[in-house]
Amino acid sequence: MTTIVSVRRNGQVVIGGDGQVSLGNTVMKGNARKVHRLYNGKVLAGFAGGTADAFTLLERFEAKLQAHQGNLERAAVALAKEWRTDRALRRLEALLAVADAQRSFIITGNGDVVQPENDLIAIGSGGAFAQSAARALLENTELSAEEIVKKALTIAGDICVFTNSFHTIEVLEYPTVTPV
């Protein structure tokens, strides 16, 4: 499978993923790009699961973003609804992690759109390892979101045999509002 991690902190939201594509117990490719910028660079998306399935869902999600003028939540709900009700899409096995300047979501084939606690997402075979590492770093360091994603992916790759050390990391910066 893979590992995808997303962290939001101090005016940055970051999604990173490894590059391993496996077929059974064989590594087929080590430098796949599983994290992408969508909607003119305003939305980040990462996927875990079957590569062909995930690319199909990514294309559908991008179409939903266009149809909903970049509204991440509406696009996510529309994709989840279509994914759940369309007979062909229901067979696709993948998870999407998506984020914009305001929100982050996990979209599943069961029709779930989940806004994670603490704006931390970790999916895929190494997701639990990456989530544990990222959570510890969020709670105990002042590292940037990008540094946390890099370290979480590295730790997951050291533990999970379906996660490698080739990382794609996308950073979306946004202004932070300081209370007066």
UniProtKB/Swiss-Prot annotation:
Q: What is this protein called?
A: ATP-dependent protease subunit HslV
Q: Which residues bind Na(+)?
A: G157, C160, T163
Record-annotated active site? T2
Q: Could you confirm whether the keyword Lipid biosynthesis appears in this record?
A: no
Swiss-Prot/TrEMBL catalytic activity: ATP-dependent cleavage of peptide bonds with broad specificity
User: What keywords would UniProt list here?
Assistant: Allosteric enzyme, Cytoplasm, Hydrolase, Metal-binding, Protease, Sodium, Threonine protease
Q: How does it assemble?
A: A double ring-shaped homohexamer of HslV is capped on each side by a ring-shaped HslU homohexamer. The assembly of the HslU/HslV complex is dependent on binding of ATP.
Q: What is its EC number?
A: 3.4.25.2
**A GO CC term assigned to this protein in UniProt:** proteasome core complex
Q: Where in the cell is it found?
A: Cytoplasm
**Looking at the keywords, is Cytoplasm present?**
yes
Q: What class of enzyme is it?
A: hydrolase
The organism's lineage is: Bacteria, Pseudomonadati, Pseudomonadota, Gammaproteobacteria, Aeromonadales
UniProt similarity note: Belongs to the peptidase T1B family. HslV subfamily.
Q: Name one GO molecular function term.
A: metal ion binding
Please explain the role this protein plays, according to its UniProt record. Protease subunit of a proteasome-like degradation complex believed to be a general protein degrading machinery.
- GO biological process assignments: proteolysis involved in protein catabolic process
Activity modulation notes:
Allosterically activated by HslU binding.
